[in-house]
């Protein structure tokens, strides 16, 4: 079942998404100067492929210290991930707005385990999700494994 589930999730995460969304994801990744492993795009805008309203992203970053934020926010992330912030991205005449959640892959993995008291991660990522940006093939494979774990936990 796991291989089949992984295959289904890999196909789902590879769905086409609007170019401005991919560009926004790449910009988020650039903010952490190489420490981002993946940017996930999910939520109602993924279902509709609309650029209106607030886009939803999860940024997986190797080390939370690499993400540009204040020291107190970094400490808070270690205690209660993810950190969530609002970002805007102007591309041509189009202004995109997004809610951006940030956590490490290990925090994501811990949140998708059966023993986790926080159900928000595995519940959220049991729904459609696209990988809007990945650093490389290894990061993509690891991200798909994390998403498979979320679905298996649900």
Short names for language-model regions:
Residues 58-60:
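Short hydrophobic/aromatic beta-strand micro-patches
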Residues 1-35, 40, 46-52, 62-154:
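Catalytic core of pol beta-like nucleotidyltransferases
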């Amino acid at each position: 079942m796991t291989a089949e589930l992984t295959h289904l999730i890999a196909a789902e995460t590879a769905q086409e998404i609007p170019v401005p969304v991919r560009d926004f994801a790449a910009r988020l990744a650039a903010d952490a100067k190489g420490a981002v492993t993946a940017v996930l795009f999910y939520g109602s805008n993924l279902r509709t492929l609309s650029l209106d309203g607030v886009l939803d992203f999860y940024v997986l970053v190797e080390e939370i210290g690499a993400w540009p934020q204040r020291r107190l926010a970094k400490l808070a992330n270690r205690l209660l991930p993810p950190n969530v912030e609002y970002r805007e991205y102007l591309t041509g005449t189009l202004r995109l707005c997004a809610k951006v959640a940030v956590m490490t892959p290990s925090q994501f993995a811990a949140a998708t385990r059966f023993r986790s008291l926080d159900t928000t991660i595995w519940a959220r990522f049991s729904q459609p999700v696209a990988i809007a940006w990945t650093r490389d093939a290894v990061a993509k494979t690891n991200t798909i494994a994390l998403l498979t774990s979320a679905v298996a936990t649900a």
